[in-house]
Amino acid sequence: MSIYAKNPIMPGFYPDPSICAVGDDYYLINSTFAYFPGLSLMHSKDLVHWEQIGNVMDRNSQLPLMKAGHSQGLFAPTIRYHEGVFYVICTNVSHGGNYIVTATNPEGPWSEPYYLEGADGIDPSLF
């Protein structure tokens, strides 16, 4: 079976994408900077047709953006799946630094962020 895809596959604003496969499903997350709700989560069965299934950071308690400027907020998230749990690691450059959130269902609910003390820098990844 062959599938033809146009470029870009996802027109619009989806910077710094990260993707993971779980069985026949693909999940893609991207930077959302100072926008709320944060971290758009997309789903696809074929890597061509994508549908937004939610936002990882969708509660005010998860995402303090009061002091975030236009070029701040959430940078370059990474999504992974291991033994029944989805993990997202990301940087909130406006508040707290690097953090991890988890969920057993990609549509949520996602946990409150666990900030990683001493893990300075931006654009973290999990392996």
Sequence positions of predicted segments:
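Carbohydrate-active catalytic/glycan-binding domains of CAZyme proteins
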Residues: 1-127
